[in-house]
């Protein structure tokens, strides 16, 4: 140990250690091998530095980071005699592959030996059978014929051996054809790995690639599964027949037929004899059962997929001249009812409905609708109107009318979707045969839709139309029922038709030329087909002009010879002075500014409009200004704001309800989400207002009403009816089921908004020209419907015909279209007996089309 301490430190500055050599190392150096490789960079110390008994040892590099000095660079030694991980992996799978390949080879050799053994035994059996036949022949024949029989036997030996070789070859081929796929699928990964040298990058195995290709083939191509099943069946028949040919004495054709019978019917193998034929027959029958199980599965899946496609509405609608409805809303039921009534005269029709809903849900909702379709069939399909493929699925290019329903919810979003739907419809390559009727939610967006759709589009601004209609009905009680009769197809509606026999006739004479219709206007051909409502009596019909009439159906009227009608004069010239009115709005609508503008144009000066809702006053003014209303420019009305809840009695009692001429209960869209909830709120407000009004009636009126005994069982209804004679209340009703409640109580002249919009959509869908007529009747300017008192046209007890009153109304530039008797509940539009004379009462009222005052 003292010798080691004498080693100079300066000679090992590079972390090189020197070990002394023990004596037994020097004595037997060959007996112990070196544990470390010799470092080529070892620096030998000078021999003079060490004593004579000390031997210089080699330096060894350890796996430590060398500390380099300023004069020396670090040296890195690479050890390369250890095998890499890649080489070990290659050796592992090569050894496994060799072992498994050897096992497969031994199996094949064993099978071949068995096959050869079987062949040898079969040849021995054939030889023994030949010897038996020869001995039997020798016993029967004389000795002279032995040579000939021997020659005959020698001639037959060669064909028998050839036949045996063929059968053995067939048996061998059948086994090989069964083993080859197994070997390929078993060792295909090793083949793919053998192509990888030392590349350690990740690659997909060939087995997975083949499985992926098969999966793509089966999923992409529609006839892939039946084709695979057919190929599997043919392979089973071929392999089975080939195997039967090897184990039986039948020819190949008969063996193939037997194989088919085993595949087709698993019970046919019961007649097989022998171990070999029975094993093969059982195997073929088992494969046949699998084949038929797969076939039944494919057939069942195909049938289920087809029924599922039909159930979910994925199949194509092969129809022509049908009505197509895109979208789903609460108006669909009323719309289907009106279209079914319109198609009744044609023997029924076809209506296709496509919406982004499940087909079963749509059919279930339509099945719950309580009306008769009258021979019209409704077909539902699931899809989006924004996708051209879904539009083609409902034969959009062959439809005679396309109706686009507005969505429930935000008006701008609904109109934006309608705009995109129109863009999709105009992008159909085949073109459109019919016109497009679009239900709009906001009047400001109507221009954009017409700009995109062009001449193909007809718009019905539902919300604004209902608002203006409510104002008309509020100022003229009973007008709501008249609008329902005219817009619906159940009674009389508008029709336009050309009658060449009327050319050259004055419009005054045309008015009394139709016994079953009432002319209302002329479609002037010289004006580009413009419809003129209520033209002058002196207008002469020209060639190409068409007559606008109100009739029960398009085939129920025709011109007749002119009747003899006595012309009279009006009793006196009535001029109704306008008096200020007080109107109350309960609730809030998004088109409030439009309703205020219409009221300001129709009411007398110094009129008042009270707005009662839960919207703060500052927010109301902001909404009205944003809608384009300048409150300072209102000429005839002044706004009175009251804040409160319309379903709270205490808030309603703070209003002078008995002093209003008209009360409009609006469906408050900001509060309620569904039609039923909105109607419930409107109905509650209506009953509260009528009850408050009835309690504020004078005592004398209530006493006289009670003494009459008319309402002994329901005095509250009688009191409300008494109050309704003073104030007209119009309720905006969204759900048609609420109609019966209000009609039974008779306490409100209701407006069924959704049903009226559906009627307008159906009418424009059947004839797009009617849209111009409706737009003028609903607009601020032009003509409108009015209810007139009878004393304007006749005297008390005067006997006149309907035609005579019509000619008197023409002196006021009005077109008489119907009447309502004093003791009747409903008006009669387009009465049948127009020439029959009868006595009239001054309490009767007449319905006319006249210019707006």
From Swiss-Prot:
Compositionally biased tracts (Polar residues): 38-51
Membrane topology recorded in Swiss-Prot or TrEMBL: Multi-pass membrane protein
Pfam family, one: Castor_Poll_mid
Consequence recorded when altering residue 590 to H: In castor-17; no nodules formation or arbuscular mycorrhizal symbiosis
Domain of life: Eukaryota
Outcome (variant: residue 760 to T): In castor-14; no nodules formation or arbuscular mycorrhizal symbiosis
Name of this chain's protein: Ion channel CASTOR
A Gene Ontology biological process term: monoatomic ion transmembrane transport
Tissues expressing this chain: Expressed in infected and uninfected roots, leaves, seed pods, and flower buds.
Induction notes from the record: Slightly repressed during the first 2 days after bacterial or Nod factor treatment.
Coiled-coil stretches: 117-137
Origin species: Lotus japonicus (Lotus corniculatus var. japonicus)
């Amino acid at each position: 140990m003292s010798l080691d301490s004498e080693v100079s430190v300066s000679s090992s500055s590079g972390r090189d250690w020197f070990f002394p050599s023990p004596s037994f190392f020097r004595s037997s150096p060959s007996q112990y091998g070196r544990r470390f490789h010799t470092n080529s960079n070892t620096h030998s110390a000078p021999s003079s530095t060490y004593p004579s008994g000390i031997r210089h040892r080699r330096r060894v590099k350890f796996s430590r980071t060398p500390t380099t000095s300023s004069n020396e660079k670090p040296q890195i030694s690479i050890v390369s005699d250890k095998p890499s991980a890649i080489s070990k992996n290659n050796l592992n799978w090569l050894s496994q592959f060799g072992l498994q390949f050897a096992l497969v080879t031994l199996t094949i050799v064993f099978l071949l030996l068995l096959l050869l053994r079987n062949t040898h035994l079969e040849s021995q059996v054939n030889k023994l059978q030949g010897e038996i036949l020869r001995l039997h022949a020798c016993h029967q024949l004389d000795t002279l014929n032995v040579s000939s029989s021997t020659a005959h036997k020698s001639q037959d030996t060669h064909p028998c051996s050839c036949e045996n070789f063929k059968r053995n070859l067939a048996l061998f081929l059948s086994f090989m054809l069964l083993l080859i796929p197994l070997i390929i699928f078993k060792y295909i990964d090793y083949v793919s790995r053998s192509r990888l040298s030392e590349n350690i990058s990740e690659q997909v195995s060939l087995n997975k690639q083949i499985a992926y290709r098969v999966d793509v083939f089966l999923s992409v191509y529609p006839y892939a599964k039946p084709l695979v099943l057919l190929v599997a069946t043919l392979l089973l028949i071929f392999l089975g027949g080939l195997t039967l040919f090897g184990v039986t004495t039948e020819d190949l054709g008969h063996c193939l037929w037997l194989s088919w019978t085993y595949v087709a019917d698993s019970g046919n193998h019961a007649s097989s004899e022998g171990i070999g034929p029975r094993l093969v027959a059982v195997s073929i029958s088992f494969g046949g059962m699998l084949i038929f199980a797969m076939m039944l599965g494919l057939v069942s899946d195909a049938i289920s997929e087809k029924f599922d496609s039909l159930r979910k509405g994925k199949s194509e609608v092969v129809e022509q001249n049908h009505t197509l409805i895109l979208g789903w809303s609460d108006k669909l039921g009323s719309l289907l009812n009106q279209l079914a009534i319109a198609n009744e005269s044609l023997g029924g029709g076809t209506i296709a409905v496509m919406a982004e809903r499940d087909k079963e849900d749509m059919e279930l909702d339509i099945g719950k609708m309580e009306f008769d379709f009258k021979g019209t069939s409704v077909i539902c399909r699931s899809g989006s109107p924004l996708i051209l493929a879904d539009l083609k699925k409902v034969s959009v290019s062959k439809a005679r009318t396309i109706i686009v329903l507005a969505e429930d919810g935000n008006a701008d979003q609904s109109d934006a979707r309608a705009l995109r739907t129109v863009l999709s419809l105009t992008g159909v390559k085949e073109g459109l045969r019919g016109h497009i009727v679009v239900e709009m939610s906001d009047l400001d967006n109507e221009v954009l839709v017409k700009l995109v759709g062009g001449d193909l589009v007809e718009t019905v601004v539902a919300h604004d139309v209902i608002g203006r209609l409510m104002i008309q009905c509020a100022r003229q009680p009973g007008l709501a029922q008249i609008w329902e009769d005219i817009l619906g197809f159940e009674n009389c509606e508008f029709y336009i038709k050309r009658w060449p026999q009327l050319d050259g006739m004055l419009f005054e004479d045309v008015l009394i030329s139709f016994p079953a219709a009432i002319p209302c206007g002329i479609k002037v051909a010289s004006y580009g087909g413009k419809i003129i409502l209520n033209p002058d009596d002196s207008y002469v019909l020209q060639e190409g002009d068409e007559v606008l009439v109100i009739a029960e159906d398009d085939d129920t009227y025709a011109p007749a010879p002119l009747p003899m009608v006595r012309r009279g004069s009006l009793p006196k010239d009535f001029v109704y002075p306008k008096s200020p009115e007080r109107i109350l709005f309960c609730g809030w609508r998004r088109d409030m500014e439009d309703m205020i503008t219409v009221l300001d144009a129709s009411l007398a000066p110094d009129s008042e409009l009270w707005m009662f809702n839960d919207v703060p006053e500052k927010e109301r003014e902001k909404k009205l200004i944003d809608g384009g209303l300048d409150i300072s420019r209102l000429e005839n009305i002044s706004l009175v704001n009251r804040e409160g809840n319309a379903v709270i009695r205490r808030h309603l009692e703070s209003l002078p309800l008995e002093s209003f001429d008209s009360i409009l209960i609006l469906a408050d869209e900001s509060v309620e989400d569904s039609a039923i909830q909105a109607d419930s709120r409107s109905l509650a407000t209506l009953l509260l207002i009528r009850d408050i009004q009835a309690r504020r009636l004078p005592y004398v009126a209530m006493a006289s009403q009670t003494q009459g005994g008319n309402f002994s069982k329901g005095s509250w209804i009688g009191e409300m009816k008494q109050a309704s004679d003073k104030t007209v209340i119009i309720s905006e009703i969204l759900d048609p089921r609420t109609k019966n409640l209000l009609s039974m109580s008779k306490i409100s002249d209701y407006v069924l908004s959704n049903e009226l919009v559906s009627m307008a959509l159906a009418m424009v869908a059947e004839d797009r020209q009617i849209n111009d007529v409706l737009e003028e009747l609903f607009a601020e300017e032009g003509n409108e419907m009015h209810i007139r008192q009878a004393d304007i046209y006749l005297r008390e007890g005067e006997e006149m015909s309907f035609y005579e009153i019509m000619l008197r109304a023409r002196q006021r530039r009005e077109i008489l279209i119907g009447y309502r008797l004093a003791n009747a509940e409903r008006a009669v539009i387009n009465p049948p007996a127009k020439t029959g004379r009868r006595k009239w009462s001054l309490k009767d009222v007449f319905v006319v089309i006249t210019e707006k005052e």
